[in-house]
């Protein structure tokens, strides 16, 4: 049975902790002594042109924050975010998201219309992340949405319309070059009589439109704001579209002489996405299909296939595969704040969230022999409630702020899915699974899980002379997901700040406007690697056997019980400061941090018996991250007619896997020091003794390239070219295994990242240019490895230049390992604020933008902006799955009434 924290257990624990120290209210984070990267989004959204995802606004505007599209599919709205790198192997690395006080996630944030967001605040430091206890180790993104202003009735409307054009595509042999190469090599190539570029066949000019309407009204005592947003995107890949509709209402009411403030909000969104079912098959087929084959069906209604090619299908036929997603999200929340005394506030907050996600897939019989259909539905409900008591008072040279808070979070998830094959007709798609011939064993399932988290929080902040500040925080979390022996965990932090500018010895330095120093140390946790039933013995069906002539399902253990399982703990130290000169027209910030993750989760091989299963998830490993973040901004020109502003953030980050060995209940446990985590495989990978490329190695950054070293090419007896591999161990034999003749030759994660913005205003005209960059990392060009392989020709088409190279070797080596450094011009926007003289129209703005303007890089592939941050099998590997790079041209209009 699922173990819950009962309300009386929660209250008793809260009372016990409260006797020792005051607690802290989550809603009062802003009272802490912390330095946060705050990104106001209004101008960012307006200047960036087409913005389909709220996280696009954050990308490049906060030091140490990296936003990456999931996988290789840039049509998807969902992104992955890393704050100061990776802190766990199997635990969650996406930051916690708090939207107007409501606990959320990256997926939900991606559905919010960007213009609804007033600002992001990224919490990274020790004192900041410790506030969120067992969920703060990967950083926290606080999102503040817009509210009514109480300035009377107002209406605003914004729209952007854009076209997307492919900016770069693979240069494969044309039909004429394909036939000429086959003739020159003396090999037979089937001539279908057509001349096709299949990338052109499956792509189109994309079209995207965004519309946003908001109105607000009321007075300072009672106000409201409502907004509606719609995004419609016809992507550059034919038949693949998505749209998103969002609605949001907020009401604020003051009562009893402003002693009581109530805030009520409702948010809802619906999202539909016609995604690509098999990204690799689609784009690999488009590149490598015989260019003389027809783009559509032949005269008999059949598709022309090459039966000798592995995972190659006519690209237009692959487009008929469907992978559709429908998601609905609803949230309502209420906050009440009552002023008990001039220095004492009592607040209560509650929220309810509901998510429904439907996934449907269909593969027709002309792609898969028996066809394939899938339907699944996933639902989630969340309840959140907290009560806090906050005190703030100043007397003389002293100031004190303190708070108490308790919180309870409950989550429930259900799911059902089924998969079938043996399609009678393709006409039904995925809408009539009953018409299929079979449902494979294990392809139908359902789940139910729930989890709860109880929290107690404390905060005290003391300020002397309004320039020396000391802050102490403590959070205790009790989770139903961890082991019985570790139900509660405690996460303290301490931080200090010195406002040097207010010192007497700087009173004569008028050029210095701001000078602050700060430091902090704290603990935070990570529950991401633990699900609802991870600590228990789990079983699942293993087969069907006859019992008394009745088919009976057999069950087997799939997980060991671990009552000692707990959250990972990250300890962070940071020190930094900021200086502002000449009325802060020149600002410089710098911060160094070091964090160490201990009790890191990892799955270990264990003996059976005494264990019931051969794997055990345990808290044993350790990992470190350290870095330096620098921020710079300058406003060199500020006049009535001209404003020029330049800002930049630069982050240096170093990760290290410290250990995977340790002790569990008196038993020494360890994992392999070298483990492959990413490979070149799938379509087009013909030959090669060991295709592993990316590894986790103890003592190295997580995700390094561990490859044989190629010293050049040599011509074999047949006159073809192969890679000459260095014999590192000098044993006379080239070993492509995971040791011997391999060496560490770079990392997939950038050592440094850059974000920069230049904005210029001349009278009513303005211009904004955003640049992002990443440096110090490598990319394995698996696409070039596969598409330059002449041993697969003419079954597969190849890139131009491949026949001249005549390489027939498919073994991986550092020959195709390239520098991944790049500087990307993210967007350029030029606009005009139209002068208006009207009692109705308050402002009118028109603009034109180009997104993904240009990229400066030495990388030879389509784009260096692949997954370089999320540790998975695709990290740092360009492996034929790349979504086409495209450029967006858009115009925008914003009007306020």
Question: What do the PLM-derived regions correspond to, one by one?
Answer:
Residues 206-209, 244, 250-256, 264-270, ...:
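Extracellular/periplasmic, surface-exposed regions of secreted and cell-surface proteins
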Residues 1-256, 260-269, 315, 329-331, ...:
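Short, small/polar-rich motifs associated with maturation and membrane association
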Residues 747-779:
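Glycine-rich, aromatic-lined ligand/substrate-binding cores of catalytic
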Residues 97, 393, 462, 704, ...:
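Short aromatic-centered micro-motifs
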Residues 156-191, 417-419, 618, 635-746, ...:
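Conserved small-residue
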Residues 732-733, 766-827, 862:
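C-terminal beta-barrel architecture of Gram-negative outer-membrane proteins
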Residues 280-315:
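Acidic, glycine-rich flexible loop segments
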